[in-house]
């Protein structure tokens, strides 16, 4: 029996609507070190998207270095595989040397069928396989995600029978049945990205990465999800890591909740109600996404909201009863004059309240001034062209 922690999609260095997440990510790594110690974890598996960018900042690299060092010191073997956000070459630097210290980084196509063996359990870390790059090199029959994973799993199946213990596969892919969030980068190729879970048949456990919501695809196939929410679409998700006990023919998996540095709140309503409603008290200390439904857009809405909800990061307006027909289509624009278009826009943003006569007069003046300025610029351009021709 081997005890594993399955995690993925750390996205170290990412920001959340311009708010840096390094402190929250450091807190998660502190938590993970404690779990390794308290639960007697043999290996930590990180199934892709270790970094958020191909070229991470120095602080981000230092955070990863400190984190994996402490995990190894706590007694775990650490296995990282690259995801579609990672630079395989940069993440895989000095991987052979680091493996001797207990840090196994798999980013290469050359070791797909070569496992990391932990207590007789063969762990096969498959990096993200970009079909256009991997297909020919690993003998896939077509350039799709399903084909390259089938080819990679063919190498795993060739090796696995020679091993005495269970087989565990790490992969970074979109597997059929998984639910997406707003924060994943699309990996579709020609509109085809999903891989059927049957491609992993015969593995005792499959530790998936890429989708940020924790979910079980089958009894043996799971996404750990990202340990930290990366979009407001993940507000209701229970973030964590999967603690897995596995041996041949036996599997037990449970979620270990991750610490929540800051909760997320999604609020909707008119400005007055949101500022007064006591039911929103918990949102006062959360990162907030707020949609205002006032029929007339309030002045200084963000400033007012931030007096109660100081960490309002996203503000949208969806007025009740607002016109939903797009006003910017080519047909509508061609049929309307400049003054009418400006008046229509003013009415649109004010939920149908048309411009007054005084406002139309101001708009008419502004439109005429813009025509004069535009005409002067065109005249200057024509003169410059004429001089150049001369």
Predicted region positions:
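Residue-level detector of anion-binding/catalytic polar loops
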Residues: 42, 77, 104
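Divalent metal-coordination and catalytic microenvironments
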Residues: 9, 29, 44, 49, ...
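Catalytic-core regions built around general acid/base machinery
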Residues: 63-75, 192-202
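Accessory, non-catalytic peripheral segments of nucleic-acid enzymes
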Residues: 38, 43, 246-390
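Short, surface-exposed connector motifs at secondary-structure boundaries
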Residues: 72-80, 284-286
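N-terminal active-site segment of His-dependent metallophosphoesterases
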Residues: 1-69, 73, 365-369, 389
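A conserved active-site cap/scaffold subdomain adjacent to cofactor or substrate pockets
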Residues: 197, 204-260, 266-267
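His/Asp/Glu-rich metal-coordinating catalytic cores
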Residues: 56, 82-207, 211-216
């Amino acid at each position: 029996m081997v005890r594993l922690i399955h995690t993925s999609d750390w996205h170290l260095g990412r920001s959340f609507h311009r708010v840096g997440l390094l402190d929250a990510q450091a807190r998660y790594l502190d938590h993970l070190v404690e779990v390794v110690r308290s639960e007697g974890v043999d290996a930590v598996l990180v199934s892709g998207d270790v970094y958020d960018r191909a070229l991470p900042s120095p602080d981000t690299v230092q955070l990863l270095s400190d984190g994996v060092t402490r995990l190894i010191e706590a007694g775990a073997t650490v296995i990282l595989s690259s995801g579609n956000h990672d630079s395989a070459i940069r993440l895989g630097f000095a991987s052979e040397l680091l493996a001797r210290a207990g840090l196994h980084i798999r980013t290469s196509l050359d070791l797909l069928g070569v496992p990391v063996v932990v207590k007789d359990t063969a762990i096969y870390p498959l990096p993200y396989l970009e079909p256009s790059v991997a297909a020919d090199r690993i003998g896939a029959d077509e350039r799709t995600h399903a084909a390259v994973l089938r080819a990679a799993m063919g190498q795993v199946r060739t090796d696995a029978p020679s091993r005495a213990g269970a087989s565990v596969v790490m992969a970074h892919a979109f597997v059929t049945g998984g639910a997406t969030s707003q924060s994943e980068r699309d990996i579709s190729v020609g509109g085809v990205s999903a891989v059927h879970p049957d491609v992993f048949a015969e593995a005792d456990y499959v530790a998936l990465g890429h989708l940020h919501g924790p979910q079980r695809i089958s009894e043996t196939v799971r996404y750990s999800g990202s340990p930290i929410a990366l979009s407001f679409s993940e507000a209701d998700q229970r973030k964590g890591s999967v603690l897995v006990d596995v041996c041949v023919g036996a599997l037990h998996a449970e979620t270990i909740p991750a610490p929540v540095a800051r909760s997320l709140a999604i609020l909707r309503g008119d400005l007055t109600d949101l500022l007064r409603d006591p039911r929103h008290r918990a949102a006062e200390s959360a990162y907030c996404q707020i949609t205002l439904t006032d029929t007339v857009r309030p002045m200084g809405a963000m400033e007012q909201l931030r007096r109660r909800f100081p960490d309002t990061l996203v503000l949208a307006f969806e007025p009740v009863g607002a016109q939903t027909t797009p006003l910017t289509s080519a047909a509508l624009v061609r049929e309307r004059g400049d003054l009418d278009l400006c008046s229509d826009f003013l009415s649109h943003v004010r939920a149908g309240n048309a411009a007054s006569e005084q406002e139309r007069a101001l708009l008419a003046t502004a439109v005429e001034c813009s025509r004069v300025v535009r005409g002067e610029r065109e005249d200057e351009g024509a003169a410059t062209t004429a001089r150049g021709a001369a």
